[in-house]
Design a protein with these regions (language model features):
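A local structural motif
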Residues: 68-77, 172-178, 226-227, 244-257, ...
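Paired acidic/hydrophobic, glycine-rich loop segments that form the ligand-binding mouth/hinge
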Residues: 98-101, 273-277
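Glycine-centered hinge/linker elements that transmit conformational signals in sensory
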Residues: 188-193, 227-259
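Short helix-initiation/N-cap motifs at beta->coil->alpha
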Residues: 77-86, 180-186, 254-268
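Conserved N-terminal structural module of periplasmic/extracytoplasmic solute-binding proteins
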Residues: 2-9, 13, 21-110, 123-128, ...
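Short, solvent-exposed loop/beta-turn-alpha elements that line the ligand-binding surface or hinge
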Residues: 117-134, 177-180, 198, 217-240, ...
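C-terminal lobe and pocket-closing loops
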Residues: 121, 281-291, 300-395, 425-433
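Hinge/lid segment of periplasmic solute-binding proteins
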Residues: 104-158, 293-295
C-alpha cells in the first residue's frame, strides 16, 4: 500500500521544521496569505495530492468561494511521492500552506495543527455516523488524537474483498457472509475451487497476509514488542496458508497480477473469483456486468476483523494567518464536499448517513454490503512509523513465496530486524513527546 504512505524521513523533517516555524511568532506563517483585516480578501493555500481529481477539486474550490465570497482558495497539487519534500521546502522558507493533508498523529501530537472540536460544535457536524476508524483515535489514518479531532475528509476509501457471485454459483459455493468474513483458510480453499486455468480464471488475488491480517497478530498489545509475535505460530501459520494458495496455482503472485493496481481490471473481465483491494472504482465493474458482492477481509477465527480505511484528511496549520477561514473550509469539505465528491467521482461519503441520503448504493447489493462493512471499521494497534518498522516482513514474504525459506525460517530472520526498527520508532516517538 505504498500509495498511502509518506516517508518517515520526510515526515520527521517536516515535524522539526514546522515546530521551529510554530515557535517563531515574529516570522508569522500561513502560506503567504494576505492579512484579511478590515474586510480585505483572504487567500487560503491548500496543498493536495495529484490524483486526477481536478473535476472534483475545481467544483470544491468554486463551491467554497461562492459560499465564502471574501475568500480565495488556491489549490496546488503535487505528486504523492513529492508532497513531503515540497512541504519541507516550503516550511523551511516560512511559506507553508494554510491547509494540508494529515499523515497520522505525529503532527497532531506536536501541536502543529489546529483542533477542530469548536468548529465541529459550532457547525453542528454530527460525527456519530462517520466511518468509526476515522473519527476515533488509534488508527493510522485516524483524525483523532487524545480526545481532539485535527482533520476531516470528504470520502471513505477502504480495503475489502470483492467476489464474483456468478463464479460462486457455477462452482456451487455459498456466498460468504458480509461480516464477519471468511477465515484465511476458507479464502484459500474457495480460491482453489474457483480457479479455472483453461478459461484464464484465477481463484483470488491478494498481495500478502498483511493485506488482511489484524496488526495485533504481529505486535504485543502495547505495540512495543514484535519478536515472538511476528514470528509466532499464528503468523507463521497464516504465511503457510496463503503461500499454499500460490503453490497450488490458485492465487497469482503480485509480480504476475498486482491486486492493488490491476485487481479491479481483472475482476471486471471475469478473470478473478475474489480480490482483496481498494473498494473504489466500482463503475468499471458494474459497467462490465459483473454480479459482485463485498465482504470484510478474511480474518482468523476468534479475531476481530481489521481493514484499512482512509480519507482525504485535511487539517489546518497552526501557523495559518487565517485560521477561521481555514476552519470554514474544512467544514465545507466534510459537508458540501462529500456531496460534490459523490456527484462527480461516485466516491463513498465519509458520513455513512450521507451515503444513505444520496443513495450511494443505488440498490446494488455489492455496494450495500460495502457500506455494511464500513460500519465495522475499527482502529488498529498503534505502531509509530509502522510501514518502515514492518519492512523486513515483506522480505520474509518474498522468501516464502519464492520457495527459498520456510515461513518459520523467514520470519525468525525478519523478527529481530523488525524489533530493532520498532525500538527505534518508539525512541523517536518518545523523544518528540
Amino acid at each position: 500500500m505504498t500509495w498511502r504512505r509518506v516517508s518517515a524521513a520526510a515526515l520527521s523533517l517536516s515535524l522539526v521544521l514546522m515546530a521551529a516555524c510554530a515557535g517563531n511568532d515574529e516570522e508569522g506563517g500561513g502560506g503567504g496569505a494576505e492579512t484579511g483585516g478590515g474586510g480585505e480578501p483572504v487567500t487560503l493555500d491548500f496543498w493536495v495530492f495529484e490524483e486526477g481529481l481536478f473535476g472534483y477539486l475545481d467544483a470544491l474550490e468554486q463551491g467554497f468561494e461562492e459560499t465564502y465570497p471574501g475568500v480565495d482558495l488556491v489549490v496546488t497539487t503535487y505528486p504523492e511521492d513529492n508532497y513531503g519534500v515540497k512541504l519541507d521546502t516550503a516550511i523551511a522558507a516560512g511559506k507553508e500552506p494554510d491547509l494540508v493533508l494529515v499523515f497520522g498523529p505525529d503532527q497532531m501530537r506536536a501541536g502543529l495543527l489546529l483542533p477542530l472540536d469548536d468548529m465541529i460544535a459550532e457547525k453542528g457536524i454530527d460525527l456519530s455516523t462517520y466511518v468509526p476508524s476515522i473519527v476515533n483515535p488509534g488508527d493510522e489514518f485516524s483524525c483523532a488524537y487524545e480526545d481532539h479531532l485535527y482533520c476531516l475528509g470528504s470520502y471513505a476509501g477502504s480495503v475489502q474483498m470483492l467476489y464474483n457471485k456468478d463464479l460462486f454459483d457455477a462452482a456451487g459455493i455459498p456466498y460468504p457472509a458480509t461480516y464477519p468474513p471468511l477465515t484465511p483458510e476458507q479464502f484459500v480453499d474457495i480460491a482453489c475451487q474457483l480457479t479455472d486455468e483453461a478459461n484464464g480464471v484465477w481463484g483470488a488475488a491478494v498481495s500478502d497476509p498483511l493485506a488482511y491480517l489484524p496488526w495485533e497478530m504481529f505486535f504485543s498489545a502495547d505495540g512495543k514488542t514484535a519478536e515472538g509475535y511476528v514470528n509466532g505460530p499464528d503468523v507463521v501459520h497464516q504465511f503457510e496458508v496463503l503461500a499454499s494458495g500460490y503453490d497450488r496455482g490458485c492465487i497469482p503472485s503480485s509480480n504476475v497480477l498486482d491486486p492493488w493496481q490491476q485487481g479491479r481490471d481483472f475482476f471486471a473481465k471475469g478473470q478473478l473469483g475474489m480480490v482483496i483491494t481498494d473498494f473504489q472504482g466500482l463503475p468499471k465493474i458494474e459497467e462490465a456486468g459483473i454480479n459482485y458482492g463485498s465482504t470484510s477481509s478474511p480474518t482468523p477465527s476468534g479475531m476481530e476483523p481489521y481493514f484499512f480505511v482512509w480519507t482525504d484528511s485535511v487539517g489546518v496549520m497552526a501557523t495559518s494567518d487565517h485560521p477561521d477561514q481555514a476552519l470554514d473550509f474544512v467544514a465545507y469539505l466534510t459537508t458540501e464536499g462529500q456531496l460534490l465528491r459523490h456527484d462527480i467521482n461516485d466516491d463513498i461519503p465519509l458520513d455513512l448517513a450521507v451515503a444513505e441520503e444520496v443513495d450511494w448504493a443505488g440498490g446494488i447489493p455489492g455496494r450495500e454490503e460495502g457500506l455494511e462493512v464500513l460500519s465495522h471499521a475499527r482502529s488498529a494497534i498503534f505502531i509509530p512509523n509502522r510501514w518502515d518498522v514492518i519492512g523486513p516482513y515483506y522480505d520474509a514474504w518474498g522468501f516464502v513465496v519464492g520457495g527459498e525459506k520456510t515461513a518459520q525460517e523467514a520470519l525468525d530472520e525478519a523478527a529481530p530486524a523488525i524489533q530493532e526498527n520498532l525500538d527505534k520508532a518508539w525512541e523517536v516517538w518518545d523523544s518528540q513527546g
